[in-house]
Amino acid sequence: MLALYQAYGLDMFKHLRGEFAFCLYDEEKELFIAARDRYGIKPLFYTVASGRLLVAAEAKAFLPLDWQPEWDVKSLVEGGWNFDDRTMFKDVKKVRPGCYMTCDKDGNIEHHRYWDIDYPDKASCSFLGFAPG
């Protein structure tokens, strides 16, 4: 991941395939990056506790870092934990599949989609290519 980021910057996501969830910190740009694979196979959660951005593969990793779990009843009832960036816990969000988030030195968090199901495939083919004989 580091080599891809050094070569392509945030365009690195065009070159990634497979399962992943990772975090990078660009010291020069003072930019934190957290990313998740296209299909969301690998989990990645985040929250802000005591003025700090916390990111982990499991929400329980936040427990020793001043995070107090509280059920998000609305998310549970609406199924938001399954269909959007909400989780079962208040103020804990998911990095969505096919997305990455950035956080600058001022704590500004931005979300970016690098892939979705409508993303054009590099290998194009037609129905006739699959038709027999």
What are these regions (language model features)?
Residues 1-133:
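Cysteine-centered catalytic environments shared across enzyme families
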